[in-house]
Design a protein with these regions (language model features):
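Conserved positions within compact, well-structured domain cores
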Residues: 1-119
Length: 119
């Protein structure tokens, strides 16, 4: 995910944390997400920004064939490195309305999404 593509800059994240309250909801697709309900029904999103973020899970960074959370989470690599050994990743989860950013080892199995620069 390109940080600037959707107006989500470094100052909004304040390091490695959550973005604004509804950023995740606005990026998630309206379908394909497992419901989550602890008094609130998050699950899928509104796709307000047209990103259509689909749940797809991830493969853990231990190199095992553990692949999980296919209908509950979605992870994408950023094109930006946090350090020599870590790269930024973004994730959406069925139990959060926010977009999460954290630095992870490149051996983690996350999705890649090619984005066209806006004209």
């Amino acid at each position: 995910i390109a940080d600037s593509q959707y107006g989500i800059g470094d100052t909004i994240f304040n390091g490695s944390t959550f973005s604004g309250f509804n950023a995740g909801t606005n990026l998630k697709s309206t379908y394909g997400w497992a419901p989550f309900n602890f008094g609130q029904n998050f699950g899928g999103g509104t796709d307000f920004l047209g990103f259509t973020g689909l749940a797809g899970g991830f493969r853990d960074f231990y190199g095992c064939s553990n692949y999980g959370y296919v209908t509950k989470q979605a992870f994408w690599w950023s094109s930006t490195k946090q350090s020599e050994d870590l790269k930024w990743q973004f994730d959406l989860r069925n139990n959060f309305t926010t977009l999460i950013r954290s630095a992870q080892p490149e051996r983690s199995g996350y999705s890649v999404r090619c984005m066209k620069d806006p004209d």
